[in-house]
């Protein structure tokens, strides 16, 4: 199928999920094509008639903004910009993020406010549709002036430079372009700056983090419900009336989800000896709910961002204006990444506490969830693993957005550090997925000690699928294998 990049309607996270899942081919709408061409024509005419320097178009960049560049060197200026700014370091950015970077850069340029050539946007679409993913590096962006270094690496293949991942192999971009019958592009005035100035590195991470976070929010409720039954917990804390009198949206959603997940559970319905449960069970709606509300806020920030123009300077043909502003500054994203990381990390923190309770030898469960504790260590050490991951997340949740380091001789004297916030948040979310997998392994084991009583039909169906991969553990075995298998089950679980 094809997906039309259109400026007449917003693109949502749901749209992006559909594009990714359906492996859609991108095309530009007629209106987007007209906008791009009209903006470029306006700039060409403006350059021919105006002698006053325009930042980034016929001047240097950053603190070199007062250096005027002669007309016969403008194309070289743009090529030099891309080459000189491609100085990333560290690990290669995951291909799933690079794919999103291409998509979001195309989306931003389609508004016709950046004065790029139509063929430049077409070539970005060619890269996306042919699954030619530029090699980009994690380190190098300050999250202001756009994601300069990552976007420079993203743009190098347009010039026949740099490296790409194509068909699973790391190749020279020039070789792949030739193989596909594509010629390198010669950048015209302003184009290099339009390609590099933008927040698409941060935004791509944001889209990925939110798509994953939405799933983790649902998973946490489902796995938390399994743990509640495994722990022989009470149902009263999830009744609707207690949440209606404190009606935070996420709290209400979570309580409803727990009730639905446990509907029909024989374990939940049996008489209880204990008067109340620990907070990690009793307060699931309040804790998980707060994370849902935080995720919803961050979602609104990024849906605004991916439907924005974050180039500089910005070209307004209809107003006969070229404005040097600051839409490239990533502060809204940096703060949101820090917020999301903290919120999602709490799903992992409370999950580890439930694991600790399950292995503690209370509620008629054997110590460490194994029939012969002592001879067997059982589920003792997976909790250690969970604790180490929770601790790492606490370190990763130190805010990046409160930091700023002056750059470019003081011209760029405040930066967001949003790119660092993005890569940290990505790691936190990966860690929480592991923590929920550890909880599922423990909770499924605990449920077996409640037999012959059954949990809810929904949970029993899930556990039946789970047991096809990971059987009940009677005696000690290499737990790494069980943990990895559980993680893959969680990653591929369709909920």
What is the role of each PLM region?
Residues 136-141, 318-322:
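Cysteine-centered functional microenvironments
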Residues 55-69, 73-77, 84-109, 137-159, ...:
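FAD-binding core of FAD-dependent oxidoreductases
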Residues 2-24, 28-35, 39-42, 47, ...:
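C-terminal auxiliary extensions adjacent to catalytic cores
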Residues 113, 142-144, 374:
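Conserved, non-catalytic sequence blocks in retroelement Pol enzymes and Pol-derived host proteins
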Residues 2-51, 81-134, 228, 243:
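Glycine-rich, flexible loop motifs
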Residues 49-53, 131-137, 151, 172, ...:
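Hydrophobic alpha-helical context, especially transmembrane and signal-peptide helices
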Residues 73-76, 120, 213-215:
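Short, low-complexity, polar/charged sequence segments that are solvent-exposed and flexible
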């Amino acid at each position: 199928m094809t997906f039309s990049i259109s400026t007449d309607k917003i693109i949502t996270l749901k749209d992006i999920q559909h594009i990714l899942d359906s492996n859609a081919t991108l095309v530009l709408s007629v209106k987007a094509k007209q906008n791009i061409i009209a903006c470029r024509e306006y700039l060409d005419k403006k350059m021919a008639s105006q002698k006053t320097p325009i930042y980034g178009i016929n001047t240097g960049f950053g603190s070199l903004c007062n250096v005027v560049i002669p007309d016969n060197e403008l194309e070289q200026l743009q090529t030099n910009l891309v080459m000189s700014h491609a100085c990333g370091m560290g690990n290669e950015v995951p291909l799933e993020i690079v794919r999103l970077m291409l998509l979001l850069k195309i989306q931003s340029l389609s508004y016709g406010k950046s004065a790029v050539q139509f063929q430049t946007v077409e070539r970005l679409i060619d890269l996306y549709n042919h699954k030619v993913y530029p090699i980009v590096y994690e380190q190098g962006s300050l999250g202001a002036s756009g994601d300069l270094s990552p976007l420079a690496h993203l743009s190098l293949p347009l010039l026949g430079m740099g490296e790409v991942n194509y068909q699973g192999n790391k190749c020279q971009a020039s070789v792949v372009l030739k193989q596909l019958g594509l010629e390198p592009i010669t950048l015209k005035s302003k184009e290099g700056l339009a390609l590099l100035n933008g927040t698409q590195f941060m935004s791509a991470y944001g889209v990925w983090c939110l798509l994953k976070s939405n799933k983790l929010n649902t998973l946490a409720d489902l796995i938390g419900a399994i743990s509640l039954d495994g722990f022989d917990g009470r149902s009263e804390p999830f009744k609707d009336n207690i949440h209606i009198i404190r009606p935070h949206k996420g709290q209400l959603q979570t309580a409803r989800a727990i009730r639905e997940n446990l509907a029909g559970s024989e374990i939940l319905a049996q008489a209880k000896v204990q008067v109340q449960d620990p907070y990690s069970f009793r307060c699931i709606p309040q804790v998980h709910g707060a994370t849902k509300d935080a995720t919803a806020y961050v979602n609104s920030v990024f849906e605004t961002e991916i439907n924005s123009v974050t180039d500089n300077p910005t070209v307004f043909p209809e107003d006969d204006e070229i404005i040097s502003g600051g839409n490239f500054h990533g502060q809204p994203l940096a703060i949101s990444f820090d917020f999301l990381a903290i919120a999602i990390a709490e799903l992992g923190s409370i999950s580890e506490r439930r694991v600790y309770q399950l292995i503690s030898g209370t509620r008629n469960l054997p110590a460490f969830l194994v029939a012969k504790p002592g001879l067997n260590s059982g589920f003792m050490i997976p909790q250690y693993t969970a604790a180490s991951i929770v601790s790492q997340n606490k370190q990763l949740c130190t805010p990046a957005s409160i930091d700023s380091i002056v750059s470019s001789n003081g011209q760029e004297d405040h930066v967001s550090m949003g790119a660092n916030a993005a890569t940290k948040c990505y790691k936190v979310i990966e860690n929480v997925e592991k923590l929920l997998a550890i909880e599922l392994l423990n909770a499924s084991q605990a449920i077996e000690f409640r037999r012959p009583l059954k949990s809810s039909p929904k949970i029993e169906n899930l556990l039946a699928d789970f047991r096809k991969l990971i059987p009940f553990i009677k005696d000690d075995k290499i737990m790494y294998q069980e943990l990895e298998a559980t993680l893959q089950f969680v990653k591929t679980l369709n909920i």
